[in-house]
């Protein structure tokens, strides 16, 4: 299981991304608009750079909701392969049965 600090850090990043998403999108639109004056675009880039680093969606990493594991993550269920196997074996995922052949 991942350290609690890593899990909390990731949750904090998710909150920051949600908080600054609209402002970030607005500034990016201004900065990438070729029809606007160069000075206005440059100011938008500076404002964008002053936003918190963790407010960028690029810094997010998918982690298992149960264990915090960063690898082998199923996006639909938001759990890792190991947690998925455990939940499936316990019958906690509807429609999922253990396969044998």
From Swiss-Prot:
GO terms for biological process: translation. The keyword Cytoplasm does not apply. The keyword Coiled coil does not apply. One of its GO terms (cellular component) is cytoplasm. SUPFAM superfamilies: Glucocorticoid receptor-like (DNA-binding domain) (SSF57716). Keywords: Ribonucleoprotein, Ribosomal protein, RNA-binding, rRNA-binding. Binds 16S rRNA, required for the assembly of 30S particles and may also be responsible for determining the conformation of the 16S rRNA at the A site. HAMAP family: Ribosomal_uS14_1 (MF_00537). This is Small ribosomal subunit protein uS14.
């Amino acid at each position: 299981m991942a350290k609690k600090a890593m899990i909390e850090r990731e949750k904090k990043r998710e909150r920051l991304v949600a908080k600054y998403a609209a402002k970030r999108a607005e500034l990016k639109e201004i900065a990438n608009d070729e029809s606007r004056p160069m000075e206005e675009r440059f100011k938008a880039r500076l404002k964008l750079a002053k936003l918190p680093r963790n407010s960028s969606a690029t810094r997010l990493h998918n982690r298992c909701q149960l264990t915090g594991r960063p690898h082998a993550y199923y996006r639909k269920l938001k759990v890792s392969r190991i947690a998925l196997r455990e939940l499936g074996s316990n019958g906690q995922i509807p429609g999922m049965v253990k396969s044998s052949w």
